[in-house]
Structures are given as structure tokens and as C-alpha cells.
């Protein structure tokens, strides 16, 4: 079938901010889809609220709207643009839910707008738990015993009928939001209540648990002519019971017999045909390991997280194909862009093994509940490729950028036996390391299988690696043992640990004996057809398939897995750096380990190496490619941390030198620079012992800001108000050394701001000053920010510009840098300097039109700012107002305190743009799904000492019709000042009743000292999040919301 000519203009719905369950994979799929539609000649409109994406670049679609993803906002854009059709299946669950909601308003029928790809009936049939169960029964496909419920009592009643354990699956949610496994009535009442509240249709499926079955995923495609094919079959290392987003996954499947594979494949294809899905679809199946019995778990009728993984694992661009299918093309008409000779209907074949491991945020949230179940908790993931499953697993572990670089964990090694077995029986994020430890202690495969229900095949992979560890440790500097270990993915650092030497010595010995990796190509067809894909992975094997070209090359280091503090913003900068390198006439090479991102789309760079971002793996690529130099400024702290090791190995670091990168992080050197430039900074001291930290704090005076050096995202950063709190901080953050000291700064009250600047060594371009809406003490990544600034006069701006110019030149910055300031008593103080791209680069780039990463890259490559047409100083401010708002995933992470602090907690961001500050704020709040009705009900729970600051806010809310609720200690103060209290709430149970009944629309909680889990302030915050009620812990955020509500309020005025 040829592509459709009756439609010309297509609106694509993006996925919005990154949250747990919906991350960078949708930037990748949305970008692919928009470009595919433009390639076919269609006019495209993109709507997305997330500025930190490649998808929202103006060249990706004909019309780009960075607007809230709400029915109201989309309706306005649809009436403005009049598209012929909407493509909703590339925006994750948000895209699907919006398509359903838009249809229910009648707008699509009114304007004659068609939904492309999967039709509404199919979406409904796949997403509505009851309808899906009915369809499975019609098709004769087995599903676990289940019942759809709309109340908690119905859920408990069914659990009694079928027996515990049961799984709760809310309808129309993603990442298992609100779901969980329940073992008794108490757990059922808690989980079902939460699931029903989070389901947009107040519906859950209660399902008899089949935990322990093998979990198999098929990524399948179908077109309008009913051609179907399997892109990839993936097998979860973890059995059913752990959300697939929190599972280790292998591709292709590792343990299925041909009979099992064909049986499950037939089921997957039957389902996509029955649902009449046009495009990509993810089918999840559970297989009884003791028989040929299986159950259908669910179908995602859209491009998903697994689609991105399958695309990168096979090289088959699922989202691109899905977009082309949506406009009428069929699989037998679309050329495979990898081989350029075969068609899209040919199923990919893999002659390698891929391993995905999730990246969890528990290094940031040490108090969080780390248990894994049916609700996803990972913020991102890594992927590794090897010739064996062992090699892929080892490479994936070291891609995670956590304390463990292999399967050895000191914590697991010292754990008592009962703790070890508990960790296996009740899985947490670190189960893999405890699993390895059981084999070191002599457990059999059967014993570990009984504890974990993990397939003996996967257990044997871990056991084999432990056995190889033992062999290695007894044969230091043995060439044959070295070769074997490298084939199974052992790093030089791991071998060095086992040989009691340094990784440099292992590398030297390896090179002397010519034990070197080769690089293999990903070609989708296991070399069956000719292919020249520039997409490679390393292996200790024969025949190198990556040939160095004569063209000079530049290597760009990516940022690895998405995590809190290092999100998709850094991938955005990486991709734009690649574009600038290519336009400058160089070959652009990328190393990255993240399957979700645009930078790991092999069509973006000239060569892509899917490798761990470790010194060894990067040096191996450099040995082969011999690039002119390496750019580390756009890969976040991941790339910066590699700079010193690379430089010591003779690698040319382009842009700011390693010594100058260190100058910004070394407290003594930096302090001297500030003094020499006659600039101001808060009084600060450095300490390398616990006692020295306490003395420094006493010398400066409380409150103080304490943090380790060399961190990203404010990890382990805290404001402490007395010695007791400082002692507690030091107990929780014990790792303090001469090389990595603790920094202690005076805490200044004032307005924070930040700038991103580009310096060529002489001139300094400042695209804009971003004012933080929250005062000092909230991490910049968790602060709302406004550009242009709303509260700085020309003198303050001049001080900021002068300080930026002086610092950039003095620190010998060549490229990009970020500086954070605080304005205290009309004076500008420097808080910190980051000699790299920051998370605000996409935000400012979208607003100003300056592609900052590209401009900085050209500077790094030797082109001055003047030659690029830029003048020194602050770029002219726009007429429009732009607000960036953080987005959090607290509802996915039990026991994480939501009180905003110097340590970053947000997972994503949105942007609001309009002609006034209040309108821009309104859009930002709306995009972040903070929607408080006019004339609503507000609960104030206030820290002692905050009453004076809170009082005027409460009065203003009351004046525009809001009902005020308080705790007893706040009530008397409010009453004394003439504020009517609608109700006093005296305990947490009373609050829970009101929250459940929908009687509270916003909770304001400033009880910062209540961080213990049994404290009132903490419990109030947890209850508020559990009920999905907006929560604000900063009075500056409250004031911003109040400005919006006052702007929207109509005042009743008497005639005088």
C-alpha cells in the first residue's frame, strides 16, 4: 500500500517530563517518528512540555510547541493548527491517555481529525483490564485468574476467593504505577486504594500471582495489510513478580526451546492481529518453567521502553517504522535502513548477546524502600553487548557507574548468612551481588534457585563468573587465563583486584601480550546480508570490523544512564556537539551505554561504540580510532571524571584542560582565584576529617551548607542548623579523604541564579541569567527558574556578567561552563562553578535560539566567538517569559522524603512560556501536573519560626476565596491575625481521611526538621504524595502559585 495522500498535517504528542516509568526512550522514539514523517513529506506539529529533549528542537518538526500536555492545552493547539490526524502512540502512556481524553471531549469528531496507528478501540481493549481479559478468553489465550475492581472491598473479596499472593494492576498507568504484590488483607487495602486513586478510570485488575514464572517479552510490528513480524524476543533474568523495567533483561532469549519460542511467538502475533494494532507493540508473557503452560501478562499498544531497548539491541528502528506504518506504508515496502537492501519485514537476527540492567536512584535516596516488585523504581538503564551472556552481564554492571564495578560487593561479602538469604528471597536493587556471594560461599544452583526462582541457566552464568574469579586469583599474570577472563567480560580493574596489582599494570601486561579487543558490527542480520552500519561493540575475538578512516575524528563521551542529577539534558548536549563536529569537517565518534537516548541512535554519529564509560573501555576505542582529541564537557560528571585518567594516558582533552577543570573543583585553588579577581563568595572551609568538619562549622557559624567535592546533583549535600545535625550527616556520609574532602560553606539567605557561559579564552558569551524562584537551600535542579530574571535590577545583572567574564577567563575555560550565584544584600556571591555543560543548556538554547552545545563545540575546535558572529557579554533578553519547573517521582519511591533540600530529587522538568510571568508560571505548573482548583482548600503545616513568613500568604489565599486548614499550633497564630480557619487537623489519621475524601487540594509543609520516618512532618508529606495531592515545601513556590491564582481571580467590587 502506498502512503496516504488524503492527510497532510500530522500532530505528534510527546511524552512530557522524565519520570520513573517514562524516561528518555520517548525522546528517542518521538525524534525518530517526527523525522520519518517529514521524510515522507508530511507537515508535522509536535507538542511536548519537556525542553530537555532533542524532540523539541525546531528542526525535528515543522511546528514545535513546548506547552503543557493537558487536554486544555492540546485542544487550543488543535484549533489553532487544524491537523488532519494525530499520532499518539509515540508519547508513552501520557500520549495514549491524552488521545482517549481528547476523543471523549468530542473535539476530534467535531474537527474530523483521525487517530493514526493504533485505533482508540484497540487502545481501550489493551489498556482496560476487563476488556483485555474478555478478549483473551475469546482468543483462547490463558490469563491468570483475575477480576477487575473499582473499590478496595471488591479487591479484598476477590483475594479471599483466589488466595494470596495477588498482583494489583491499575488500568491506564505506566511503569506499574500504583500496583504491587499483596500477601495479606492489610497490604491489599493499601495497594488497591493507591492503585484505584492513580488509575484515571478508577479501575484495577486483581490477579492471582504467577510470581516465579519466566518473563518473556516480544517486540512485534504489524501494518494495515496485516503483515506481522517479531523484532526481538527478550528474556528477563528476574522471574515474574519484578516489573520488567526493574529487571535485568537479555536479548535474544536465552533459555527457550524452539517449541517454547514458536508457541510464545504465535501467541504474540495472534494478539497484535486481534487488537488490530498498526505499528509497534510490546507483548509480555509468563512461561511456567516446569511445563509448556503460559499466561499473557499484558500488551502495550504503543512504542515503549522495551521498544527502545529492542531497537538498540537489534539495530531495527521500531519507532521510525511505526510512524511509516501509521501513514499507510507496509512492512514489505519499507527498506531496512541498516542493510539498505532488505525490507522491514525481515526479522532481525542476532549473533551476539545483549544485557540491560536498570539504574536505580538509591545511591541518592538511601532511606528509600529498595525492595523490587510490580511497581517500577529505576530512573534509567544501561545496555551492554558481548559474544557471551557472561561478557554482556559484566560490561553492563560496570556501565552502571555505581560503587560495584563487577560482581563483587564488599557489603555482600561481609553480610551474615541470614541477611544474604533474605536479600535473595526478597529482591532489592543489589540482589545480583548477593547472588554472586552465595556461590563464593559454596551454595549450589538448586539452593539459590529455591531462594530466588531465577532460571538455573542465569544462575549458572553468575556461578561461572565467580569460578573464573577464583581461577584468576590463583594465576596472576598468566596469559591464557587473562585471555579467557577478557572473553567473559572481566575488566582490567577487576583483574587487578584479583592479582593485587594496579589496572595500569594489567593494561600494560595485556598490551605487551597483544590481548586486545576487536570491534564487531551490529547489522540486524547476523552478517547474512551486506551491511555497513557504523554501530560497534567490543569483543575479545577474531576479525576487527571497525576500520579507522583517513578522515580526522573527534571522540565525544556520552553521559551514561539516566539518573537523578544527570538526565536527558546531557544527551541533548552530546547530540548537538556531534552535529557541530560533523559540520566542522571531522568524523564524530560517540561512546555511550544508554539504550534510551538519541545519542545511541547509530544514524546520529559517524561511528557509535556501545561501550561502558570506563577508562579502560574508552582507551581501547582511542587506541583503535586515534582521534584528534576527546570532548568531555557534554557528558556530565561521567565524562569529567574520566578526563584526568585519559590525560595521564596521553589523550588530548579538547577545550578546557584537565588542570583547569580541577581548578574549579579544588577549594584552595578556587578560593585563590576568587580572591585574585576581587570577587565575593560565602565564607567556606575544607576539611578532611570529621573533627575538622565540626571545627570548621563552629568557626563559620550555623547554619552551614556541607557537601563532598566532585559530585553532581548535590549528592550528599545538606544544610545543617546545629552540631547534632552535622554529626548525623557525618555518620551517613562517612567517606571523607584528603583527595575528596568535605566542603563547609556559610549559608546565605537570598535569591539564587545561574548562568551558562561560553568562553573562547578571550571573549565570553552569556546567553542568559536564570533566576531561581526558590531561595537558597534548594538544589538548582529542584528549583523553578525564570528567564529573563524578574527581581534583578541592571546593577545586579552587571555584577553577574562581570563576575562571569572574569571567572571564565581566569579559569581558562575553552568551551562551556555553568556558574551559580546568590544575591545577598544587593551583592553578588559566587556559589560554585561547573566547568562543563549543565542541565539548563537545552532550556536556554530553546529560548534564545543559540545552539549552545554547538557554539561551545566550535569554540573547542578553535573557532572564536567573534568568528561565529557573537559579541562579548549578555545576549539580549526576549520579550516573552520562560519558566522551568522540576518534576518529581516521589509516588514511585516509598520512604523518600519529599522536602526540598540542597540534594537534588527531581527526575525531569517542564517549561512554560507566555507573555507575562503569571501566564508562564501557570503553564509550568500545569505541565508539572500541579493543578489546584480556584476556591480550593489549602492545608498549612508549618515549621516553628515560619509563621511570620507564612501569614501574608495565608491571608492572600483567603482573600481570593480559598478555605484554610491548619494544624493546632499554627491555628492560633492565624486566628490572632484575622484569618478564618475552616478546620484544625490534630493528627495524621484525620488528615488521611480528608485527603482520601478529596477535601484538601494543596498541602503546604515547611517542617524541615521532621525528616525521621515517624515524625509528623514526614508523615504528612508521605500521605499527601500517596493521595496524589499537590505538595509544596518551599514558600517561594507557594508564592509563585499564589501569583497565578491571583492573576486568574476575579474580584467582586462594591459600588461606591
UniProtKB/Swiss-Prot annotation:
Residue stretches making up the MGS-like domain: 930-1056
Keyword list, A-Z: Amino-acid biosynthesis, Arginine biosynthesis, ATP-binding, Ligase, Magnesium, Manganese, Metal-binding, Nucleotide-binding, Pyrimidine biosynthesis, Repeat
EC assignment: 6.3.4.16, 6.3.5.5
Binding site for Mn(2+) 1: 284, 298
Biological role: Large subunit of the glutamine-dependent carbamoyl phosphate synthetase (CPSase). CPSase catalyzes the formation of carbamoyl phosphate from the ammonia moiety of glutamine, carbonate, and phosphate donated by ATP, constituting the first step of 2 biosynthetic pathways, one leading to arginine and/or urea and the other to pyrimidine nucleotides.
Segments for region (Allosteric domain): 930-1056
Binding site for Mn(2+) 2: 298, 300
Positions of Mg(2+) 1 binding: 284, 298
Chain's gene name: carB
Name recorded for this polypeptide: Carbamoyl phosphate synthase large chain
Catalysis performed (reactions): hydrogencarbonate + L-glutamine + 2 ATP + H2O = carbamoyl phosphate + L-glutamate + 2 ADP + phosphate + 2 H(+)
Positions bound to Mg(2+) 3: 820, 832
GO molecular function: ATP binding; carbamoyl-phosphate synthase (ammonia) activity; carbamoyl-phosphate synthase (glutamine-hydrolyzing) activity; metal ion binding
Gene Ontology biological process terms, A to Z: 'de novo' UMP biosynthetic process; glutamine metabolic process; L-arginine biosynthetic process
Residue ranges annotated for the ATP-grasp domain, each copy included: 133-327, 671-861
Coiled coil, from the record: none
Quaternary structure, from the entry: Composed of two chains; the small (or glutamine) chain promotes the hydrolysis of glutamine to ammonia, which is used by the large (or ammonia) chain to synthesize carbamoyl phosphate. Tetramer of heterodimers (alpha,beta)4.
Binding-site positions, Mg(2+) 4: 832, 834
Cofactor(s) needed: Mg(2+); Mn(2+)
Residues holding ATP 2: 707, 746, 748, 752, 777-780, 820, 832
Residues annotated to bind Mn(2+) 4: 832, 834
Amino acid at each position: 500500500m502506498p502512503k496516504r495522500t488524503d492527510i497532510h498535517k500530522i500532530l505528534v504528542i510527546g511524552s512530557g517530563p522524565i519520570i520513573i516509568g517514562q524516561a528518555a526512550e520517548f525522546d528517542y522514539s518521538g525524534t525518530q517518528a517526527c523525522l520519518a514523517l517529514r521524510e515522507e513529506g508530511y507537515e508535522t506539529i509536535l507538542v511536548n512540555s519537556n525542553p530537555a529533549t532533542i524532540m523539541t528542537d525546531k528542526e525535528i518538526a515543522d511546528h514545535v510547541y513546548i506547552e503543557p500536555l493537558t487536554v486544555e492545552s492540546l485542544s487550543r493547539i488543535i484549533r489553532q493548527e487544524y491537523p488532519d490526524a494525530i499520532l499518539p502512540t509515540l508519547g508513552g502512556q501520557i500520549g495514549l491517555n491524552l488521545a482517549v481524553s481528547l476523543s471523549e471531549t468530542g473535539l476530534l469528531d467535531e474537527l474530523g481529525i483521525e487517530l493514526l496507528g493504533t485505533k482508540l478501540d484497540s487502545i481501550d481493549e489493551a489498556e482496560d483490564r476487563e476488556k483485555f481479559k474478555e478478549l483473551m478468553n475469546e482468543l483462547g489465550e490463558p490469563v491468570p485468574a483475575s477480576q477487575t475492581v473499582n473499590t478496595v472491598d471488591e479487591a479484598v473479596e476477590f483475594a479471599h476467593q483466589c488466595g494470596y499472593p495477588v498482583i494489583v494492576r491499575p488500568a491506564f498507568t505506566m511503569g506499574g504505577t500504583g500496583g504491587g504484590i499483596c500477601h495479606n488483607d492489610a497490604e491489599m487495602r493499601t495497594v488497591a486504594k493507591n492503585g484505584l486513586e492513580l488509575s484515571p478510570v478508577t479501575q484495577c485488575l486483581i490477579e492471582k500471582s504467577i510470581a516465579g514464572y519466566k518473563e518473556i517479552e516480544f517486540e512485534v510490528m504489524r501494518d494495515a495489510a496485516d503483515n506481522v513480524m517479531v523484532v526481538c524476543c527478550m528474556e528477563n533474568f528476574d522471574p515474574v513478580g519484578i516489573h520488567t523495567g526493574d529487571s535485568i533483561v537479555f536479548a535474544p532469549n536465552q533459555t527457550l526451546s524452539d517449541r517454547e519460542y514458536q508457541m510464545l511467538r504465535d501467541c504474540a502475533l495472534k494478539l497484535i492481529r486481534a487488537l488490530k494494532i498498526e505499528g509497534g507493540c510490546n507483548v509480555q508473557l509468563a512461561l511456567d518453567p516446569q511445563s509448556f503452560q503460559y499466561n499473557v501478562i499484558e500488551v502495550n499498544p504503543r512504542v515503549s521502553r522495551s521498544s527502545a531497548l529492542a531497537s538498540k539491541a537489534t539495530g531495527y528502528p521500531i519507532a521510525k517504522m511505526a510512524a511509516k506504518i501509521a501513514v499507510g506504508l507496509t512492512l514489505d515496502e519499507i527498506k531496512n535502513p541498516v542493510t539498505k537492501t532488505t525490507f522491514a519485514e525481515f526479522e532481525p537476527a542476532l549473533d551476539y548477546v545483549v544485557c540491560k540492567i536498570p539504574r536505580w536512584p538509591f545511591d541518592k535516596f538511601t532511606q528509600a524502600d529498595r525492595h523490587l516488585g510490580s511497581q517500577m523504581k529505576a530512573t534509567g538503564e544501561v545496555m551492554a553487548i558481548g559474544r557471551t551472556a557472561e561478557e554482556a552481564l559484566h560490561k553492563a554492571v560496570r556501565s552502571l557507574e555505581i560503587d560495584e564495578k563487577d560482581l563483587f560487593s564488599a557489603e555482600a561479602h561481609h553480610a551474615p548468612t541470614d541477611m544474604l538469604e533474605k536479600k535473595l528471597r526478597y529482591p532489592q536493587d543489589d540482589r545480583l551481588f548477593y547472588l554472586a556471594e552465595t556461590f563464593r560461599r559454596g551454595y549450589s544452583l538448586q539452593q539459590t534457585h529455591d531462594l530466588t526462582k531465577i532460571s538455573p541457566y542465569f544462575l549458572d552464568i553468575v556461578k561461572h563468573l565467580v569460578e573464573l574469579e577464583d581461577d584468576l586469583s590463583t594465576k596472576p599474570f598468566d596469559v591464557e587465563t587473562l585471555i579467557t577472563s577478557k572473553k567473559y567480560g572481566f575488566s582490567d580493574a577487576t583483574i587487578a583486584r584479583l592479582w593485587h596489582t594496579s589496572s595500569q599494570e594489567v593494561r600494560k601486561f595485556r598490551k605487551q601480550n597483544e590481548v586486545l579487543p576487536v570491534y564487531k558490527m551490529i547489522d540486524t542480520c547476523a552478517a547474512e546480508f551486506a551491511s555497513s552500519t557504523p554501530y560497534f561493540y567490543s569483543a575479545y575475538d577474531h576479525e576487527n570490523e571497525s576500520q579507522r578512516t583517513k578522515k580526522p575524528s573527534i571522540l565525544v563521551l556520552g553521559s551514561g544512564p539516566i539518573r537523578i542529577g544527570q538526565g536527558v539534558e546531557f544527551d541533548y548536549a552530546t547530540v548537538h556537539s556531534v552535529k557541530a563536529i560533523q559540520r566542522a569537517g571531522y568524523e564524530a565518534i560517540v561512546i555511550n551505554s544508554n539504550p534510551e537516548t538519541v545519542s545511541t541512535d547509530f544514524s546520529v554519529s559517524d561511528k557509535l561504540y556501545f561501550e561502558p564509560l570506563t577508562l579502560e573501555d574508552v582507551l581501547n576505542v582511542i587506541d583503535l580510532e586515534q582521534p584528534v582529541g576527546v570532548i568531555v564537557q557534554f557528558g556530565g560528571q561521567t565524562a569529567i571524571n574520566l578526563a584526568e585518567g585519559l590525560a595521564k594516558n596521553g589523550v588530548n582533552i579538547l577545550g578546557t584542560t584537565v588542570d583547569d577543570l580541577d581548578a574549579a573543583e579544588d577549594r584552595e585553588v578556587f578560593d585563590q582565584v576568587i580572591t585574585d579577581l576581587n570577587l565575593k563568595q560565602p565564607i567556606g572551609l575544607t576539611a578532611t576529617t570529621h573533627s575538622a568538619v565540626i571545627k570548621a562549622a563552629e568557626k563559620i557559624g550555623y547554619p552551614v551548607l556541607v557537601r563532598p567535592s566532585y559530585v553532581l546533583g548535590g549528592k550528599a549535600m545538606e544544610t545543617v542548623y546545629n552540631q547534632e545535625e552535622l554529626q548525623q550527616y557525618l555518620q551517613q556520609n562517612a567517606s571523607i579523604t584528603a583527595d575528596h574532602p568535605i566542603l563547609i560553606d556559610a549559608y546565605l539567605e537570598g535569591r539564587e541564579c545561574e548562568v551558562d557561559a561560553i568562553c573562547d579564552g578571550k571573549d565570553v558569551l552569556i546567553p542568559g541569567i536564570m533566576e531561581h524562584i526558590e531561595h537558597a537551600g534548594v538544589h538548582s535542579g529542584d528549583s523553578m527558574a525564570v528567564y529573563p530574571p524578574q527581581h534583578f535590577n541592571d546593577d545586579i545583572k552587571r555584577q553577574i556578567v562581570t563576575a562571569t567574564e572574569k571567572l571564565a577567563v581566569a579559569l581558562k575555560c575553552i568551551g562551556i561552563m555553568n556558574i551559580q550565584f546568590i544575591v545577598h544584600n544587593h551583592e553578588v556571591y559566587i556559589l560554585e562553578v561547573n566547568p562543563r555543560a549543565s542541565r539548563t543548556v537545552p532550556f536556554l538554547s530553546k529560548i534564545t535560539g543559540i545552539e549552545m552545545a554547538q557554539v561551545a563545540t566550535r569554540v573547542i575546535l578553535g573557532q572564536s566567538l567573534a568568528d561565529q558572529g557573537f559579541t562579548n557579554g549578555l545576549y539580549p533578553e526576549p520579550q516573552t517569559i520562560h519558566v522551568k519547573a522540576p518534576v518529581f517521582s516521589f509516588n514511585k519511591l516509598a520512604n523518600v522524603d519529599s522536602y526540598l533540600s540542597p540534594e537534588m530529587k527531581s527526575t525531569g522538568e517542564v517549561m512554560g512560556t507566555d507573555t507575562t510571568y503569571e501566564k508562564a508560571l501557570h503553564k509550568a505548573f500545569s505541565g508539572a501536573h500541579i493543578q489546584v482548583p480556584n476556591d480550593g482548600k489549602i492545608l498549612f503545616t508549618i515549621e516553628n519560626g515560619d509563621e511570620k513568613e507564612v501569614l501574608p500568604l495565608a491571608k492572600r489565599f483567603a482573600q481570593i476565596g480559598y478555605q484554610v486548614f491548619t494544624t493546632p499550633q499554627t491555628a492560633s497564630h492565624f486566628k490572632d491575625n484575622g484569618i478564618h480557619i475552616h478546620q484544625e487537623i490534630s493528627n495524621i489519621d484525620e488528615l488521611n481521611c480528608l485527603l482520601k475524601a478529596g477535601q484538601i487540594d494543596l498541602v503546604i509543609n515547611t517542617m524541615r526538621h521532621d525528616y525521621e520516618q515517624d515524625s509528623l512532618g514526614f508523615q504528612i508529606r508521605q500521605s499527601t504524595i500517596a493521595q496524589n495531592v499537590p505538595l509544596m515545601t518551599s514558600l517561594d513556590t507557594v508564592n509563585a502559585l499564589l501569583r497565578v491564582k491571583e492573576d486568574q481571580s476575579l474580584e467582586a467590587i462594591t459600588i461606591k
